[in-house]
Amino acid sequence: MRNRKPWLVLLLVAVAGLLLFVWRLGMTGLVDETPPLFAASAKAMAETGDWLTPRVNGLPRYDKPPLVYWLMGLGYALPAQDLWNPFGTWASRLPSALSSIGLMLLMALTLLRRPQGQPDGAQQAVTAMAAALAFALSPLVLLWSRISVSDALFSGLLSAALLLFWWRYARLCRWWIPWLVLGLAVLAKGPVAVVLAGLTALLFAVLQRDLPGLWALWRPWRGLALTAAVALPWYVLELLVEGQPYWDSFFGYHNLQRFTGVVNNHLQPWWFFFPVLVVASLPFTPLLLAGLVGALRPQPAPPEQSLQRFAACWLLAVFVFFTAAATKLPSYWIPATPAAGLLIALAAQNLRPGWRSAVLRGSTLALVGVLTAGLAAGNLWVPLINEPEMPTLSAALLASGALRRASLCFGVGGVAALLLWWGPSSARRGWLLVQQLGMGAFVVTALVPMVELGDRLRQLPIRRMASLALEQQRPQEPLAMVGILKPSLHYYTQQVVVYEGVQPNGPLNLNDRLAKEQRRGQQPSPASPGTSVLVVIDGNTATLPHWRGVPHQRLGTIGLYELWRVPRPALSQWSKDLAERAGLAPDWQEPRPERY
């Protein structure tokens, strides 16, 4: 029996997505360290008209293909930025938010067009909404859908392509549509999209014992040609323009080396994604595991009833591939979260009276109870938080009341779900959805305010320091940042910033780079009498011996950060003295896989 009002279900899903991902989206600044690099690259595209190569802080940025930069850049190209986009975050975050909302709608539509099992109309609506919300309420999705990076866009496009592959198997779309979307996924993050799609398809074909049928339906050779036609033109143009540096960085470092070696010290044990799977689906992890086990039964499923099995293969493909990779990050699990949402909702729909259902519901609500109690007891564990960049975080978080509101939302949702569970059979179908509504209220009333609190404590000092630097800056005076490196300083000052870390030869590097380094927006200049450099430095770095002795004038202090004016001749002399005393030398020209 088909739901007679699918548009109403989709409308409710869209409203939920807007509340979860768009509500107050642009009311906070960029979050260091990665999002400002994306935002600055996209803004540079819009301002310079160079839509081929992303560039940040005067250097090419080769780590991701251009689609996310193009979409962000379209936002930055709109007029009246100061009115609607004061922090630069509406334009840079909307692609992530809209990608997740679009995926929620596609998941719900899939379950409305091809209901799994024999649910009545009301159960179809509940399952469709529950699947979309189980995906959207994953902690990983809530976080990455509201920041300026490419993960949510990539996950949305890859997941849409995978769902459309299943649509083709269920005779719901033409063969070429999923391949077209897969090409966009390749433009969002690279060839890993094809690898994950291929691994999912292979696992599904093996479990369904229908490789010839799937091959005929999906037409992989023609499909891969279409995917290549969508994605390859940009890659070819980029290679022609940028040459070997692009090949070495994107394909060599950011793709091959991330799989075969550890990048950026992201070394994790082989079992890393087991706890990630558990945490990413809380508090519905018992339902996810039940849905996964139920999907792997040996007998093949009819094509139109095989969505649960397809979702299981999808989740396992992500798990196997990234477990095999040497570099592991929690964000690598995001492409599996839509599959987890489908498995959770279908497992809840398939619950029947008996001890097994009681255990699954009971364990899920027990996890809700644990989360409720943990949030209510925040005064016991929040003071243990030690964040050097936000020393007042613990006190501010407790004073905000956000944890009490969070506990209330989880608790009310859990009690409502328990009452429905004990109620008449017609009401039991809504127990999962009611709990999800409580979690949605948590996002709006507690999580978003906590994010805004973190912005005031961590990012506002950087924005204020950027304003101070612009006020104090003399004509042609360069700007540097040492110690804690914040790319948002580059974004908010809209100029090249020379970044140096805490290493002892930092002053030597800074002096040498000002005299020799050339990049877009920065020309080398001699340390002539009367020249100076503005330096943003954090308080801890300022106490280190190799920086403490640098002659400077302190122009202001904001939070952890100080603004110095350093005479260039004095910096040059200090660097020479430091080199002689400690035997140090500049090393900024040595090859580095990532630089900004």
Per-segment meaning from a language model:
Residues M1-S357, T557-W564, S572-L578:
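Membrane-integral, polyisoprenol-dependent glycosyltransferases
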Residues R2-N3, W7, W176, G294-Y596:
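Membrane-embedded architecture of ER/inner-membrane glycosylation machinery
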